Amino acid sequence: MFGEGSRDNAALSKERLFDKLEIGIASDITIRDKWSCGEIKKPETINYRTFKPEKGGLFCEKIFGPTKDWECCCGKYKKIKHKGIVCDRCGVEVTLSKVRRERMAHIELAVPIVHIWFFKTTPSRIGNVLGMTASDLERIIYYEEYVVIDPGKTDLNKKQLLNDAQYREVVEKWGKDSFVAKMGGEAIYDLLKSEDLQSLLKELKDRLRKTKSQQARMKLAKRLKIIEGFVSSSNNPEWMVLKSIPVVPPDLRPLVPLDGGRFATSDLNDLYRRVINRNNRLKAILRLKTPEVIVRNEKRMLQEAVDALFDNGRHGHPVMGAGNRPLKSLSEMLKGKNGRFRQNLLGKRVDYSGRSVIIVGPELKFNQCGLPKEMALELFEPFIIKRLKDQGSVYTIRSAKKMIQRGAPEVWDVLEEIIKGHPVLLNRAPTLHRLGIQAFEPVLIEGKAIRVHPLVCAAFNADFDGDQMAVHVPLSIEAQLEAKVLMMAPDNIFLPSSGKPVATPSKDMTLGIYYLMADPTYFPEDHGGKIKIFKDVAEVLRALYAGGFLDDRIDNRRDETGRGIHIHEKIKVRIDGQIIETTPGRVLFNRIVPKELGFQNYSMPSKRISELILQCYKKVGLEATVRFLDDLKDLGFIQATKAAISMGLKDVRIPEIKSDILKEAYDKVAVVKKQYDDGIITDGERHSKTISIWTEVSESLSDALYVEISKQTKSKHNPLYLMIDSGARGNKSQLKQLGALRGLMAKPNGAIIESPITSNFREGLTVLEYSISSHGARKGLADTALKTADSGYLTRRLVDVAQDVIITEKDCGTLNHIEISAIRQGSEELLPLKDRIYGRTVAEDIYQPGDKSKLLAKNGDVITSAQAELIDDAGIESIKIRSTLTCESRRGVCAKCYGLNLANGRLIGLGEAVGIIAAQSIGEPGTQLTMRTFHLGGIAATSSTPEIVTDCDGVLVYMDLRVVVGQDGNHLVLNKKGAIHVVRDEGRSLEEYKKLLSTKSIESLETYPVELGVKILVGDGEKVSAGQRIAEVELHNIPIICDKPGFVKYEDLVEGISTEKVVNKNTGLVELIVKQHRGELHPQIAIYSDAGLTELVGTYAIPSGAIISVEENQKVDPGMLLARLPRGAIKTKDITGGLPRVAELVEARKPEDAADIAKIDGVVDFKGIQKNKRILVVRDEITGMEEEHLIPLTKHLIVQRGDTVMKGQQLTDGLVVPHEILEICGVRELQKYLVNEVQEVYRLQGVDINDKHIEIIVRQMLQKVRITDPGDTTLLFGEEVNKKEFYEENRRTEEDGGKPAQAVPVLLGITKASLGTESFISAASFQDTTRVLTEAACSSKTDYLLGFKENVIMGHMIPGGTGFDTHKRIKQYLEKEQEDLVFDFVSESECAC
């Protein structure tokens, strides 16, 4: 793009010495000749008297270099002048001691030893090359059995195993020289060396082509992949067996003297010593011609010692050290949180940093932080020294340091000067999202605590109860520039996850502002006065001043003589030529509001303030918004102080109706108990009805209390109401507990206790009530601790899977899109369309409905908030947008598919790390999610409103409903899925309305999904008016309703097997209940048209737990109840919520009690029972195609015979398996399902996350495809490959005239997707380190260092943000031109790129 000359390459090479990294298996020659500086022959470490390294031992100076700089071992050569000389007496080279960190040695082994990684890591590499099982290999390697290497003249087979007895037999029969059989590493070495990989590869490919069995093909493909890895790489299989072992440099396994003459040593030294001891002993034994049994045992012990060195505990019992602790092997050095990758390469300690406790700094500006003087002196010491030297105050560093320690006056002057314009970074752990590190201008302060601006606390999640923060100093000019331009606090006032302001006033500030902006409480006309009218704002302020309100010396709210003015008095004032009715408080507030926003004349709870800040940013930009935020903070604190709002016990006013409501509730509970005693309802129903009564009481008392405290007394607000309504502290639920009742409590197992706590904290709890409430408090604390760890681990997995998703291009040019609509629950709109489409790119032109001339948004436009409003107001249901799910960028994603950067409202820039932002946005609110699974039994699982009331006038239309007219003339719903719509009355026929609704040609005003048993009070096509009851919902039972007249016959309702008669203890009434059974019975009620039971008209399956309401041979009419299934009888489902549900979704796990879903469109039918499973058939009546589902009898069906189902619709209760959605409905449906399900969890907790973040994670989960037919490509059957690789391979094959491969998409959980990344460095640093490295080494993988993680590990600049390739080139280009053009303009031709 820009001309890159030699100078550029030189600059590049300084910054990055290499741009790829290859890993392979080291051969003996490499270990011996390239890496090693000498052979270690002795196990000794250091001499016990002199403490000097022993010659030829593990710390030998001759091999590894001197222990002191420029000094040989014997002391003959000292000082730098002898540099490079090798001492003729002790053989040590005179050089720096740091070479002891890089020089390696080796141990020459007496016999070949198998590397445990290649043999024990699944799948076993050696096993796959040789075609032998792991157990066979183990017996050979550990000297238990012989293996035939060359059968010679015998009838043995190659690779046949022989035990001692068989071996002796063969020797006796054929003679010792007629065949070759060996044991141990030597045998494996010979077998690997003799393996012809090329012919093996050809043979495997032939077998794969001929094999039909799927299982066998998968097995062959896996082996083929390993063999191909060896063939295509420069590795020889015999290198997996070692003839010499490399020894780590001594300074990486140090021996440190402790006080008292003892030493602390690295475990590696012990492990190496064991290897050397056994190796030396084996060499000695071999020289002495010792008996075979002893030699064999010694060889096995050497193999085990090397195993322990490489991976202790992988084979047999781990080798223990002092205190019975397993020794840390080389593998452990890499693995886990404290391994090399995560401890040292990804998590380094930072110099020029400090930490201290934080306190609030209300006097600071938004971009400032208070830095203690002592801390600043220490952190900026090098800068101070340089400045002091430049000034000529000192000449040496030592004298400058002394001057700083003395605290000379000029030092403080210099420090003040240096700190100006030098930003520092503040960080609070845990850093859950990018707002956890921000840059500030330091202000020097006395004391030892760091001062923080109150408005940035929300971003850091900081409070001042002892929290600590770390300070980091950016040193280089580039780092300072980045901190200033990108990381300053004013640039981070919006959440990257949702675009909502994060820097909003809270607590006292909110209270102060709310108090100032409160509705008028003092009306002059009520006190015999007149409303005061002011000519302008200045006059209002003068009046306030006269009343002492703006004078800090006087603290009376209102001058009693009447000269002054009440802060909440109703007044009139002329503003911008208009007379406005307002209060002095609001006039005071509007002084700080930017003019463009107009006069704010309403109360200001925290939500309103947040909206105002967002509006301010959109209208007047960042700078004015930051000034406004600072003014808000100051005004809020001042007014909160002046208002002096404090809460007293009397402010908690208990509603007078409490006793009446409680009495009524006790009466209702008694009625329910009586119904149970009379046998009308079951125990489950009684429980759920009782709980619903108390829930209702709790809600109505809570509302009554809120109304009570919102009343003003003597024109003053209730302070408690001010605190809650402003959003400063507390909520309705806490208020309910203070002044109404505590309500229902849960047992430790999550079940709800029936009798609620009817006392509140104002009245005080009884001992019993207190003891019940203590469960919840303890559970909360225990949950929080577990939640934090789980949430952190989820974030880590998410970051790992998405870390290489960066914005790599402006526009990928795709034509693909997704369709998006508002999210509704019943008739309620949970998330309007405008919120979902803001900041996304339109995929096709959007016109005003019915008016093609009015274009609302053009294809390729990024939707602004104004456009989003327009589209939503136009009544458009759904629109097509670009998405990262459909982006076709080769690497990363493109800016157009991503849309706006929510943190600043501009189109996302190139190199932006959107993957990590997405992971942080999902992970950061993790701690707010609940950990528990909800135990929702009975009522809570269904809608809790017993009736449906319409809010508008129109015509009622049934859609997808099967109904029957009951005995009372109302319509009863027979199917599980359907809805009733209220549409605008346009005088059309019912058929027309239905047709228009089905084709989405008209919008319904309201939609109510209805389920089985709902009683609809209005007929299909009848008119309804606002406020009319249109349906009743049966809360406590799922009814099974008869839809045809006839006579009852029980089928498979066999007493004692499938049913039981239960005598109600209290009433003596007998109830027939269907029980769970394991027989071949299929309980159902059949309806025959005649009393002779000859003509069958319908059957009804009766689930277990149902109570039968009709008797045999009874005559029934349509709409009659045949049986009822109490909702409490449906086994209490544990609804997995919160964090576990998010983890389940992103890990693509199969839910425990998974639902069955329809594989085709069709009609449901049953075919009896087979092996305790009900056979459900879905038949497509057009094609005649059938799909069978075997459903366990214990599962609850949610469809009936004759129901029409769509592909992907649920047939039974439970959660859907994502993999099935992918298989049946395809990728788009799965993507939609995953995004919506994850959003559902967060929405329940009130957390706002933009869809685009979840889409990025889902994109990463669907990166791979599984090959179903390799065609003429080099891909293998069943292999999982990246889509990019798949398309590339197909393109190459098609160009050569071959047949392309076929594949199906695969859904991977995030852990599996992270491990399957192209970069082996990134995968190894995540999990399964040894397995990943073994796999990579066998195929000589190359890591091109394209992602972030691998570059951090290599110590390179990350290829994102300012390190993105394009930006780096621009930088070089500017550097190159600067020398020639100092103050000249670049001509256009020179600029062309």
UniProtKB/Swiss-Prot annotation:
Purpose of the protein: DNA-dependent RNA polymerase catalyzes the transcription of DNA into RNA using the four ribonucleoside triphosphates as substrates.
HAMAP family: RNApol_bact_RpoC (MF_01322)
Record: residues binding Mg(2+): 463, 465, 467
Lineage of the organism: Bacteria, Pseudomonadati, Chlamydiota, Chlamydiia, Chlamydiales
Catalysed reactions, semicolon-separated: RNA(n) + a ribonucleoside 5'-triphosphate = RNA(n+1) + diphosphate
Domain of life from the UniProt record: Bacteria
Annotated protein name in UniProt: DNA-directed RNA polymerase subunit beta'
Coiled-coil spans in chain: none
Residues annotated to bind Zn(2+) 2: 812, 887, 894, 897
Cofactor or coenzyme needed: Mg(2+); Zn(2+)
Keyword presence, rRNA-binding: no
UniProt GO BP: DNA-templated transcription
Family: Belongs to the RNA polymerase beta' chain family.
CDD domains: RNAP_beta'_C, RNAP_beta'_N
Binding residues annotated for Zn(2+) 1, in chain numbering: 72, 74, 87, 90
Cofactor: how and how many bound: Binds 1 Mg(2+) ion per subunit. Binds 2 Zn(2+) ions per subunit.
